[in-house]
Amino acid sequence: MKIAITMAVVMLSVCCSSASSDTCPGFFQVLEFLFMGSESSYEAALKFYNPGSDLQDSGTQLKKLVDTLPQKTRMNIMKLSEIILTSPLCNQDLSV
C-alpha cells in the first residue's frame, strides 16, 4: 500500500516539474485509470503508449497495489492530485 502512495507522489512530482506544461494530457488520463478505473481500462491506456512487456507488467503490478487501497483513499488521492496540478505553485521547484 505504501508503494502505491509513493508512486502517486512520484507521478505528481513529475507532473509538477518545471516541464509540467509539456506533460502529455494522456498522462493525466492514465493516472485517473490507475486510481479509479478497472484493471483492463488501465492496461488499455498503457498499451496505447507501447511500453513493452516489462513496463506493462510493472504498471499492472502497481494497479493491483493501488486497488488494495480503500475507495475513499483513492478518491482523496485524485482530489489531492487535482489540487496540486491546478495550483499556481505547481511550476515551482519544491526541492529541499
Curated annotation (Swiss-Prot):
Keywords: Disulfide bond, Phospholipase A2 inhibitor, Secreted, Signal. GO terms for biological process: signal transduction. It is found in: Secreted. Residues 1-21 form the signal peptide. It holds the Pfam family Uteroglobin. Its main location: secreted. PROSITE patterns: SCGB. GO terms for cellular component: cytoplasm; extracellular space. GO terms for molecular function: phospholipase A2 inhibitor activity. Transmembrane segments: none annotated. Belongs to the secretoglobin family. Binds phosphatidylcholine, phosphatidylinositol, polychlorinated biphenyls (PCB) and weakly progesterone, potent inhibitor of phospholipase A2. PANTHER family: SECRETOGLOBIN FAMILY 1 MEMBER, UTEROGLOBIN. Antiparallel homodimer; disulfide-linked. Interaction with LMBR1L is controversial. This is Uteroglobin. The gene is SCGB1A1.
